[in-house]
A protein has these predicted regions:
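Catalytic Walker B motif of ABC-type/P-loop ATPase nucleotide-binding domains
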Residues: 157-161
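ABC ATPase NBD coupling module
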Residues: 65-79, 103, 108-109
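Helix-to-loop junction immediately C-terminal to a conserved catalytic motif
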Residues: 49
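Conserved ABC ATPase "signature" region
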Residues: 109-127
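A short, proline-enriched helix->beta-strand linker immediately N-terminal to the Walker B motif
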Residues: 151-155
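Short helical segment in ABC ATPase nucleotide-binding domains corresponding to the A-loop/adjacent helical element
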Residues: 94-102, 112, 116
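Hydrophobic anchor residue at the start of the ABC signature
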Residues: 146
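Conserved ABC ATPase signature
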Residues: 132-136, 140-142
């Protein structure tokens, strides 16, 4: 479990990026921080692996304050996926994925074998192993980023807008694959996005973040959609948007789901 206990972060120039924030990420669950730009999501995420240290308050992993841990070892024990992929451009795919296992002491052949297995895990062909990142599509690069983060079998995965830079169709399939992967791997995932639909698709629990990391609401996707705590959340989630107000229509004996404007979006299965 990851626990944020009254955490504040003040950068050098003044107003707090994050002010007195407390929440937990239960083990084996996916918690998604969603909020507008500059609300402090990345700051919160980076406090888990000590890329940022809190000005006050504590971040605990399984009851241990992360500031008592060696930052380098801590970072090697936590998977981290960034929007840009963060792959080393002059290393091949397999080398990129093998980095952390190597740093953790695996022999070169073992680390390579592990990296190839990770390619299978994230649904990439082993033929891509010797390519360089620039020779991959955006979606493939993000899969490699996920493979690299998982390569040392960390308990915790931090994901900062990992699918933000790919087109909507690839993004959907990456989200779907992450959910499938999570079903079997059961990692503790803290995921940051500004896209509420991505949060609804991925989260066991969503935390809607307002300015300065203030938590506007925490709940399951269903709770957030059906019982927004206040006007800010309702507006952010877009509870009144036509695609959130689904209706049923009958089309020659088949129940068709339409949005509020009557546009068909699917059929109902019972
Ligand atoms: N290294 C830094 N030095 C000074 N201010 C910073 C630094 N990093 C972030 N900030 C400020 O802290 C606030 C929160 O930034 P943060 O990146 O955590 O927000 P975010 O919610 O992740 O935003 P985005 O969705 O745009 O990535 C912003 O006002 C930002 O300008």
């Amino acid at each position: 479990m990851i626990e944020f206990d009254r955490v504040t972060k003040r950068y050098a120039d003044g107003s707090p990026a994050v002010a007195d924030v407390s929440f937990t990420v239960p083990s084996h669950k996916t918690v998604v921080l969603v909020g507008s730009s500059g609300s402090g999501k990345t700051t919160l995420l980076r406090m888990v692996n000590r890329m940022v240290d809190p000005t006050s308050g504590r971040v605990l992993i399984d009851d241990v304050d992360v500031t008592t841990m060696d930052p380098v070892r801590l970072r090697r024990s936590i998977g981290y996926v960034l929007q840009s992929g963060g792959l080393l451009p002059h290393r091949t795919v397999v080398e990129n994925i093998a980095i952390v296992p190597r740093l953790n002491g695996a022999t070169r052949p073992d680390a390579r074998e592990r990296a190839l297995t990770m390619l299978d895990t994230v649904g990439l062909d082993r033929d891509l192993a010797s390519r360089f990142p620039a020779q991959l599509s955006g979606g493939q690069q993000q899969r490699v980023g996920v493979a690299r983060a998982l390569a040392s079998d960390p308990n915790i995965l931090l994901m900062d807008e990992p699918f933000g830079a790919v087109d909507p169709i690839v993004r959907r399939s990456l989200q779907h694959e992450l959910r499938e992967l999570q079903r079997t791997l059961g990692k503790t995932i803290l995921f940051v996005t500004h896209d509420i639909d991505e949060a609804l698709a991925l989260a066991d629990e969503i935390i809607i973040v307002a300015a300065h990391g203030v938590i506007a609401q925490r709940g399951t996707p269903t709770e957030i959609l059906t019982r927004p705590a206040n006007a800010f959340v309702a507006e952010f989630v877009g509870v009144d948007r036509p695609e959130r107000r689904l209706r049923l229509a009958d089309a020659a004996g088949v129940e068709v789901v339409t949005d509020a404007s009557g546009r068909p979006i699917g059929t109902l299965e019972r």
